[in-house]
Amino acid sequence: ILLMYLAGQNSGNALLDMEIAELMASVEDPAIFVFDYVPNAYDYLIREKGEQFFRIVRDAHPDVPILFLEDPYFAHYEWDSHAKTEVDKKNAAQRELFEKLKKQGEKRIYFLKSDDMVGHDAEAFVENIHFTDLGMMRYADWITPYLKKYMKR
């Protein structure tokens, strides 16, 4: 079982709710967890709740790989510096959480930068933020090799 905690297709959700972590922890025999909550989480939420969210999942599944993702960069960041700054802050918080966990000795955690997640044109997005079908296809093509590489099977 592959379990992803997605933000992008459930706009406004994925705010590191502990109930979601508990639900993820209850899954029997997962192959991998993908933490893809950054698009809707705020940097302060990642800093305040990220480790606790991780611990709930990790305590239930100590050997299952966990993949941390960044928020993708959108084409409009070329002219919207405020939006780019906000994403930079969220991605930095996600990276800091990952590095903290690594320093604590956590194994089987992985971090993926979003540089080439869905391409660099505006064709992957509707209204500059939600994935189109093409964006979802690019996302799937981008993440699949990593899933195959890191899954526990």
Model features per residue range: what roles?
Residues 1-9, 20-27:
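Serine-esterase "nucleophile elbow" of acetyl-processing enzymes
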Residues 10-15:
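Short acidic loop-to-helix transition motifs that present clustered carboxylates
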Residues 16-153:
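Alpha-helical cap/lid subdomain in secreted, periplasmic
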